[in-house]
């Protein structure tokens, strides 16, 4: 079976929290795992960002996960810290999670070094861009005139907009004949300046916010701003989530089969 690692979200130590007081919690949102599991994929959350433990240092590094797993999904979640891309937070609540940034960039680099596929979802797409030297809009609503409502807490994953797939792009090859699609939208940050060797493969309409990016380097790295794992099953009004999943897993299987052939 294909083995895919999923980056963790963090609840950092909080003395005010009633349960697990003073503890750091790491978790994944189950829809991500279920999305992968529909293709009989073994999913693993990747813990311990730097190998250190409360008991003693471990020799397990991020590269060890990249060696053993066949691909990586960078999950959505908290904001990317503006300091990670050389800025200061415009508002305190947009400080993001610098610890998670460094952990996920380390994971991305480890999997890219082994030429194993990486798929970034929402925040994950933003992490890919920042890791490659790009920048983000800290808040679309205040920084981009005429921006759509890209996040609505009241309706969450039911918030949608039209998205244009760039003609001739790798993404367009997965959706032949589909130039304008409907995607969900649950973010207030977004790609501003593209990172090194990244190309935009989809835009929101009509505000032209980057919705998908792909690395043109030697391994598979794709980031989508929407959440394919939240797509309503069987609802054909939305972009079909399966071509992206199958393309990612195809590249993971190529590396797995090559390893078995050695």
Predicted regions and their residues:
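Active-site-proximal beta-strand elements of phosphoester/diester hydrolases
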Residues: 222-225
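N-terminal beta1-alpha1 cap of cysteine-dependent amidohydrolase-like domains
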Residues: 1-119, 130, 137, 142-175, ...
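The feature captures the ABC ATPase H-loop/switch
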Residues: 125
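Conserved G/P- and acidic residue-centered "switch" motifs that form tight phosphate/ATP-binding loops
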Residues: 122
């Amino acid at each position: 079976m294909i083995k895919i690692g999923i980056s963790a979200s963090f609840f950092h130590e909080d003395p005010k929290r009633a349960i697990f007081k003073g503890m750091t919690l790491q978790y994944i949102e189950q829809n991500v795992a279920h999305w992968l599991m529909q293709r009989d994929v073994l999913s693993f959350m990747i813990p311990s960002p730097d190998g250190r433990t409360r008991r003693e240092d471990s020799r397990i590094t991020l590269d060890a996960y990249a060696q053993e797993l066949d691909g990586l999904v960078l999950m959505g979640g908290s904001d990317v810290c503006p300091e990670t891309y050389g800025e200061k937070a415009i508002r305190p609540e947009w400080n993001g999670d610098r610890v998670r940034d460094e952990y996920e960039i380390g994971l991305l680099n480890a999997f890219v070094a082994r030429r194993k596929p990486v798929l970034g979802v929402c925040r994950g797409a933003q992490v890919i861009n920042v890791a490659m030297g790009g920048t983000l809009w800290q808040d679309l609503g205040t920084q981009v005139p005429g921006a759509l409502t890209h996040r609505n807490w009241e309706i969450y994953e039911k918030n949608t907009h039209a998205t244009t797939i760039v003609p001739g792009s790798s993404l367009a090859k997965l959706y032949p004949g589909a130039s304008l699609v409907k995607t969900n939208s649950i973010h207030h940050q977004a790609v501003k300046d593209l990172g090194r060797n990244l190309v935009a493969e989809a835009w929101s309409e009509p505000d032209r916010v980057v919705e998908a990016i792909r690395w043109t380097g030697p391994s598979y790295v794709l980031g989508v701003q929407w959440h394919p794992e939240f797509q309503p099953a069987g609802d054909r009004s939305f972009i079909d989530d399966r071509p992206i999943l199958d393309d990612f897993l195809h590249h993971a299987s190529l590396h797995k089969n090559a390893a078995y052939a050695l």
